[in-house]
Amino acid sequence: MATIEEIAHQIIEQQMGEIVTEQQTGQKIQIVTALDHNTQGKQFILTNHDGSTPSKVILARQDSTPGKVFLTPDAAGVNQLFFTTPDLSAQHLQLLTDNSSPDQGPNKVFDLCVVCGDKASGRHYGAVTCEGCKGFFKRSIRKNLVYSCRGSKDCIINKHHRNRCQYCRLQRCIAFGMKQDSVQCERKPIEVSREKSSNCAASTEKIYIRKDLRSPLTATPTFVTDSETTRSTGLLDSGMFVNIHPSGVKTESTVLMTSDKAESCQGDLSTLASVVTSLANLGKTKDLSQNSNEMSMIESLSNDDTSLCEFQEMQTNGDVSRAFDTLAKALNPGESTACQSSVAGMEGSVHLITGDSSINYTEKEGPLLSDSHVAFRLTMPSPMPEYLNVHYIGESASRLLFLSMHWALSIPSFQALGQENSISLVKAYWNELFTLGLAQCWQVMNVATILATFVNCLHNSLQQDKMSTERRKLLMEHIFKLQEFCNSMVKLCIDGYEYAYLKAIVLFSPDHPGLENMEQIEKFQEKAYVEFQDYITKTYPDDTYRLSRLLLRLPALRLMNATITEELFFKGLIGNIRIDSVIPHILKMEPADYNSQIIGHSI
């Protein structure tokens, strides 16, 4: 007797059909032994895919028309059943109904969708499909959507379950002959904006991440590309992590929030971008009355030809303060109040060090860090959208960056170094502070999902030849370093005091070239280390090597490339503007003005 595989191949060769999911129960079935090979109407038994008890007897008879088979369950009644091979390799499928109604006549044929079994509306893109699968295939190809299957890539696709797995549905469309090159490019509006913001990268590629609150690792990233848009020429060839346009539409697989809805439920999700844009616009407005050379300097701001530090000299303190109105949303007002009071309470403990190195630093007794420096509460954009986009990720990252700078400003010893030294330290070590913040806010930011999405998008770009292997390797190494570092920190169960002292040790690093008062900075670092050691000795007396384990994690921070961090987390908000160009504006604000804005503009 022939095997199941041989019978399946015979049926396919005779164009008699193929076995697929049964529509009523959604249960997958496979062809088994033909009971009688001599009868004109061939008889089959359909069983479950695991070979369990036979479920139904099917009588199949060949009609005079080649390639058509009429099926009657249990030799009576009217029913519809269609077939496919288990590996979805079939090139043809014909579904027919044996209808005995006297009004319609015998053997009336109904064309059903080869993908899901719904009533077909015609041949679309090379295959007989329904309107639903036609639209799904068109959207997927036009927008170059990439789906992922949460199962074993063999999900049931029928009329009732076709929306559960977009990956398997798209693969099924392609397997049954729907041609990708038959989908025409989407028509563009006649009127196209001739100018694009110089502060944002020119790209409309987006990442949409399906949120799963139960598991941060089960994300379904969707990668959207507009090939007709001018692309950024930054580190990522195709600007794949950039999202410029917040507007969108609702589809079966992804909810793209419209701009007005996003504003109403999330507030201003462009904190960092608003700061950069506001500063640039302020400079352009004030410079209208100045000569053309100064105007050229301002116009080159967004191209990173001129440092934002130079641009700062043209602004008054009031103008800069107003430009940072949106920055206040990034921070917790309660925490800012505590930090402000702590700074005020410690006035007089240190004397500010000016550029004149002849002034000696004097210090009163007291710790480098107080209890107010332990709290590090990141306020995420609220509420979280059902599907996170890269703009939301960038806004979350910018809030973490601002919170880290605000934390540094709240340390009296840091302020005592003077403005130039403070700016130099933060510009040198913002990436290390940001990475420590990622580890500390691992769960709040859902960092695991963000990193997994970056990896999936890099893999997709390589498959589509959008990125060289060397470039992909560079980015993947950085992402894996981030993941390894954050995972190691999470496993150590580091508390708030330990994170605060680790950040202080990183912040007061005297080995950056160009720093003044290096001996004083080194003294602050030594004090942070001594206090850190005392805290661990008192808090974890039984963990002899805890201090060593924590300090040994710091060298890994130096391996993180700040340029790649900017590409991944911030380019979608500020384009090619460098983070170290924005830092001076934040640190040059007066603490009182900074904190008052936080209190007055909290979310």
Swiss-Prot record:
Cross-link (Glycyl lysine isopeptide (Lys-Gly) (interchain with G-Cter in SUMO)): K250
Start and end residues, zinc fingers (NR C4-type): 113-133, 149-168
DNA-binding region(s), residue ranges: 110-185
Subcellular location: Nucleus; Nucleus, PML body
All copies of domain NR LBD, residue ranges: 348-590
UniProt-listed Pfam families: Hormone_recep (PF00104), zf-C4 (PF00105)
Positions of the UniProt region annotated as Required for interaction with KAT2B: 1-178
PROSITE patterns registered for this protein in UniProt: NR_LBD, NUCLEAR_REC_DBD_1, NUCLEAR_REC_DBD_2
Start and end residues of each stretch annotated as Required for interaction with NRIP1: 584-603
Maturation and modification: Sumoylation requires both PIAS1 and UBE2I. Sumoylation appears to dissociate NR2C1 from the PML nuclear bodies. Enhances the interaction with NRIP1 but inhibits interaction with KAT2B. In proliferating cells, stimulation by all-trans retinoic acid, activation of MAPK1-mediated phosphorylation and recruitment to PML bodies with subsequent sumoylation, suppresses OCT4 expression.
List of residues that carry Phosphoserine: S197, S215, S581
InterPro entries: NHR-like_dom_sf (IPR035500), NR2C1/2-like_DBD (IPR048245), NR2C1/2-like_LBD (IPR048246), Nucl_hrmn_rcpt_lig-bd (IPR000536), Nuclear_hormone_rcpt_NR2 (IPR050274), Nuclear_hrmn_rcpt (IPR001723), Znf_hrmn_rcpt (IPR001628), Znf_NHR/GATA (IPR013088)
Keywords: Activator, DNA-binding, Isopeptide bond, Metal-binding, Nucleus, Phosphoprotein, Receptor, Repressor, Transcription, Transcription regulation, Ubl conjugation, Zinc, Zinc-finger
Complexes and interactors: Homodimer. Heterodimer; binds DNA as a heterodimer with NR2C2 required for chromatin remodeling and for binding to promoter regions such as globin DR1 repeats. Interacts with ESR1; the interaction prevents homodimerization of ESR1 and suppresses its transcriptional activity and cell growth. Interacts with NRIP1 (via its LXXLL motifs); the interaction provides corepressor activity. Interacts with HDAC3 (via the DNA-binding domain). Interacts with HDAC4 (via the DNA-binding domain). Interacts with PIAS1; the interaction is required for sumoylation of NR2C1.
Protein family: Belongs to the nuclear hormone receptor family. NR2 subfamily.
Name of protein: Nuclear receptor subfamily 2 group C member 1
Species this protein is from: Macaca fascicularis (Crab-eating macaque)
